[in-house]
Amino acid sequence: MKEKISLLKRVSIVDDARSILRDMVIPPELLKEKTNGGRITSVCEKSKEGRTTYLEVTGVIDPVDSTAPYIGWKILLPGQWNLRSVQIGGGANNGMIPSLEGAMLMSDYCPIEHGYVVFGDDSGHQSADPMSADFAANEEALQN
């Protein structure tokens, strides 16, 4: 049993994910909350020293209320996945997708370089001002 677990410890996902994810549509029934589904907006290979190290996948989740903003998100998929993931950001009023590349805040640890899937979103509103709460005027945006 230990042999099987050690073989699964690192999983290569970049090659398979790249072709599967391009232009993917996400049906609403796959998402926990009520939405109009979502879609992948870009899949970009990021490389370091001539080799692919991860995929940067961005997308949106469409609201039910046409006046509510979409939820923007980004996921970094490592070339060699350690079967772990970490979410970055999501505090306060949010309003922007945080930087997922590089070291974490107040640390020199870079999750993507250690095989973590790294993800973040804008909580369903887009604002350059993290203290803005204008989104709260829309009930669906407030719930997001």
For the regions a language model picked out, list residue spans one by one.
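Catalytic-loop region of hydrolases
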Residues: 1-84, 97, 105
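Hydrophobic beta-strand anchors of alpha/beta hydrolase catalytic cores
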Residues: 84-88, 118
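Cap/lid segment of the alpha/beta-hydrolase catalytic domain
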Residues: 92-144
